[in-house]
């Protein structure tokens, strides 16, 4: 697999209203683990649409992994021009920081927002141009990632790597066990 699309929930869909929320680090750890195994198999590009939440958190992880895997490149393909225009200042600054480090940035429709169809076109285009999809999504909690997942399921020979709430819960439990083990070393 050379090109991996990544998507998932937007922050508000997870009741996350800050990038410092503890859940973000667990989501990023899950993404990091999946990316590491795919990098060992030859992954070269990740593609995101630049939406807030999982996509930008994944880009952060990709930038961190570049130290060890300099071949990893990030493409941000927005559904329309200036998608960040109506975001608050903090989100815009975070987005601009992510975009500033990307290897490739473009708009799929090359027009400002006109209709919800631009989101559908974005999903179809990104799936068509990638070899697989890493998606933070649980079908028991519907959200916006379902639309890209539906497109991905229709493409033949297309790998889908889900990260579900069960996967995230396992990571949280593992972290808690490790934290307890560390704390116990210093009990006198």
UniProtKB/Swiss-Prot annotation:
- Please state what the protein is called: UPF0398 protein GWCH70_1907
> InterPro entries, per this entry?
YspA
Q: Which family does it belong to?
A: Belongs to the UPF0398 family.
Organism of origin: Geobacillus sp. (strain WCH70)
UniProt feature coiled coil, ranges: none
